[in-house]
Amino acid sequence: MLAPLLRRTWAPRGCTPVVKISEPHGRISVIGAITISPERRHFSFYFQLSADNSNFHGESVVQFIELVHRKVRGPITLLWDRILIHRAKPVTDYFARHRRLVVEMFPPYAPELNPVDNVWSYVKYNRLPNYTPRNLDELRERITAEFYRLRKRPDLLKSFLKHTGLSLDPIYPNDSETY
């Protein structure tokens, strides 16, 4: 949303700072995925932004999965949270048609296990606090820049997985490293 997340500021006593925003209800939705290659343990991040003031729907989620599917070679295990849109009919139909995709669901109500939720928190609380875009185009440009910056930080992407406490043992049986 265009209403900024306000963290901290300073002002003389009695002079409360006021942040002026032009479109307080404008918003952009984002879908994203962290990928980890089994051979080299290379971490990457893929994302897609919605149209202005709209949500993702089953077909747009499938388009995003197709994007990741085209970019990543070999079998894919998708760790998926249980948000309703991820269980939409177009999405489940896509999974049924593409056997190269293995879908594992996170337990219900467990956002702390989802490393992509750590991406959202990092960008919101560390990269965009107090940021007040003038319009949705400016917000879209800044979000895109932050996600491209994040792609260049595999160490940070790895830390998002490590923060969850999840182990990649079933995926990498010869390596007991916990992320």
Question: What function would you assign to each model-found segment?
Answer:
Residues 27, 59-67, 104-106, 114-116, ...:
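Charged DNA-binding/catalytic regions of mobile-element recombinases
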Residues 26-28, 74, 99-102:
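Short glycine-/polar-rich loops that comprise or flank the Walker A/P-loop
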Residues 65, 74-87, 109, 114:
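Acidic/histidine-rich, metal-coordinating catalytic segments
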Residues 88-98:
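Short, aromatic/basic amphipathic alpha-helical patches
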Residues 15-21, 99-118, 132:
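RNase H-like polynucleotidyl transferase catalytic core
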Residues 1-66, 168-179:
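Extended, low-complexity cationic-aromatic segments
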Residues 117-179:
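C-terminal anion-handling pockets and recognition modules
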Residues 32-34, 65, 81, 114, ...:
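Generic structural signal for small/hydrophobic residues in well-ordered secondary structure
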